[in-house]
């Protein structure tokens, strides 16, 4: 599946260098996530080819610090 990586807080894993981004690419390709490629899009790490079990944004019942 494709999607934004998400923190336990419910926020997207943020990034600042838009487009090709080594940090996002490395995060997406971690073994437990299984992604094939990652880049920075709208200041969040977006991954392609993630394992179905990898949580992606938005998380149910988590709104990134908003109540």
UniProtKB/Swiss-Prot annotation:
GO cellular component: extracellular region
SMART domains, per database record: Knot1
Keywords: Amidation, Disulfide bond, Ion channel impairing toxin, Neurotoxin, Secreted, Toxin, Voltage-gated sodium channel impairing toxin
GO molecular function: sodium channel inhibitor activity; toxin activity
Residues covered by the LCN-type CS-alpha/beta domain: 1-65
Domain notes: Has the structural arrangement of an alpha-helix connected to antiparallel beta-sheets by disulfide bonds (CS-alpha/beta).
Protein name as it appears in the record: Neurotoxin Cex10
Species the sequence originates in: Centruroides exilicauda (Bark scorpion)
């Amino acid at each position: 599946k494709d999607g934004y990586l998400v923190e336990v807080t419910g926020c997207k894993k943020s990034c600042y260098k838009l487009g090709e981004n080594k940090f996002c690419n490395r995060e997406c390709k971690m073994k437990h996530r299984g992604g094939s490629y990652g880049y920075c899009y709208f200041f969040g790490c977006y991954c392609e080819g993630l394992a179905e079990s990898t949580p992606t944004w938005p998380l149910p019942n988590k709104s990134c610090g908003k109540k």
